Amino acid sequence: MVLNENDKEFVKKLFDSLDKDNNGKLTREEIKEGFFKLRIPSSEKDIESFLTNVDKDKDGSVSFKEFEDFTIENIKKLKIVFEELDTNKSGTLDIHEIEESIKKLNIPLYSEQELIRLFHRIDKNRDNQIDFNEWRELLVLLPNSNLQLIISFWKDSQILDAGFDNGGFIPPMVEKKEKASSLRNTITYMLAGSVAGFASRTSTAPLERVKIMCQLNHGKPISLISAFKACYKDGGIKGFFRGNLANIIKVSPESAVKFGTYEYVKKLFAENDCELTSAQRFISGSVAGVVSHTTLFPLEVVRLRLSAEIAGTYNGIFDCFKKIAISEKSIRPFYRGLGASITATIPHSGVNMMVYEFLKHKVIKMTGNEFPTAGQLLVCASTSSVCGQLVGYPFHVVKSRLITQGSSVNQEKYTGLFDGLTKIIKKEGPIGLYKGIVPSFMKSIPSHSITFIVYEGFKKAFDVNLKEKKHH
C-alpha cells in the first residue's frame, strides 16, 4: 500500500512534537510525556513495550528512522482497517458504520451516549464523519493494529478523558466502589423521578380535576367548557387544585419508585442500555408501573375521592382517610379498583416507556448529540403519552368508577373490572370507556413532557450515564 506525502509529513510533525530537546532522538521520558498528552496508555509497562517494538538498535532511545519505520508500517495497517470499516466506500466513516463494527466484534456499549462519545473521540471537527487523517491521529502509535484491539482501545481510551492514574489507564473499580456508584445512581433516579412527578402534577392539576369529572359523568359526554365551569363553581380557583396535595404526596414517591424500579429491571435484562429490545423495555415499564402503583394505591383512592366529591365533603387528606375507613369499617375501599388499575398500568406504563425510549434513542442516533434537546424530549414524551393512553384509558375509567362508587358523585355499583366494562358499554356505549380522554390528553401530554424533561435533566446534571458507562 502506497503512502502519500501527507502521511510522511504527519510522521515528521508527530516526531518533532515528541522530541522536546530537538536532538533527533526520543528518550523514555519524552515518549512517556508524549503518550500522556496524546491520551495513550503510558505506564512503565506500556513504554517498555513500545521501546521493544521500535528501538531496534537497543540504545534506550528512538531515532527518527526507527520511529518512521514503525509509524509508516502502522499507517499501512490502519488504512486496511479503515477501508474494512468503510462499508459504503465513501472515504469516511459515519456513526452507523462504527456501530455495526462494534456489534460484529461483540464489544459492549452501555448506551447511545457512549457510542457518540466514542465517535467524537476521533471526529475532531464534529462534521459527523471520520476521515482517515482523524483516524490516523489517534491510533498511529498503537503497538498492534488489528481491528479488535483498535476498537477496544478506542472505546476504553475515553476513560482517559476523566484523568490518569500514574500515567496509565484508570484501574477497574473494586466491587465495593461499583456497588456504591450503583446505589448513588439509583438514588439519583429516584430523586429525579420524585422531583419530576411533583413538577408535572402540580402544573397540570386543573386538567386532572376536569378529567376526573368527565370520567365520573354517567350521562351524555359534557364539553370541556362545561367541565371547567363546574370546577370553578365548586370552589373557585382552588377548586381546580382540590386533591392535588394528595396527588403530590402520592405521585412524588410513586414516580421515585417507578423510575428506580424501571432502571433496575432494565439492568436485569442487560448491563448495556442499548442492547435492550423493545419487548424488554415494555416489560421493564410495566413492572415499574405495577410496583409503584400498587405500593401507593391507597393515596390514589384518597386523591380521586378528594377530586370527585363536592367541596366540604372532606376536610383534607387525613379526614378523607378516616371517613372512608369508618364508612366501610375495613381497608377494602382503599384497594377497590386495584385490579383495574394494574390492568390499565401494564399496557399504559409498558407502552409509554417503550415508545419514549425507542424515540429518544432514535433521536440520539439521528442527531449525533449525546443528549436530546428539551424540544426533542417533548416530542418523544408526547408521542409515548398518547400511545400509552390509547391502550390503557378504558381501564382507567373503570378504575375511577370503582374507587368512587357509593359516593355522592357515583351511585353506580360494580363488582369488578369486567362488570364495570360491561355495564359502561351497555349503558353508555363504547364511547363511555373514553370519557374524559380529551382533557386527559391535554393533561398527560404536558405532564409526561415535564416529567421526562426534568428526569433527563437530573440524570444529565448528575452525569449518571457517564458514571454508569465507566462502571460497565
Curated annotation (Swiss-Prot):
Q: Which GO terms describe its molecular function?
A: ATP transmembrane transporter activity; calcium ion binding
Q: What is its main location?
A: mitochondrion
Compartments annotated for it: namely: Mitochondrion inner membrane
Tell me the residue numbers annotated for binding Ca(2+) 1.
19, 21, 23, 25, 30
Transmembrane ranges? 190-207, 243-263, 282-302, 331-351, 378-398, 442-462
Residue sites binding Ca(2+) 4 per the record: 123, 125, 127, 129, 134
Fetch the SMART domains from UniProt.
EFh
For this record, the Gene Ontology CC terms, alphabetical, are:
mitochondrial inner membrane; mitochondrion
Where are the Solcar-type repeats located?
184-268, 276-362, 375-461
- Set out the biological process GO terms recorded for this chain's protein: ADP transport; ATP transport
Query: What Gene3D superfamilies does the annotation carry?
Result: EF-hand, Mitochondrial carrier domain
**SUPFAM superfamilies attached here?**
EF-hand (SSF47473), Mitochondrial carrier (SSF103506)
Q: How does it sit in the membrane?
A: Multi-pass membrane protein
Keywords in alphabetical order: Calcium, Membrane, Metal-binding, Mitochondrion, Mitochondrion inner membrane, Repeat, Transmembrane, Transmembrane helix, Transport
The family annotation for this protein states: Belongs to the mitochondrial carrier (TC 2.A.29) family.
Q: What is this protein called?
A: Mitochondrial substrate carrier family protein C
Q: Which gene encodes it?
A: mcfC
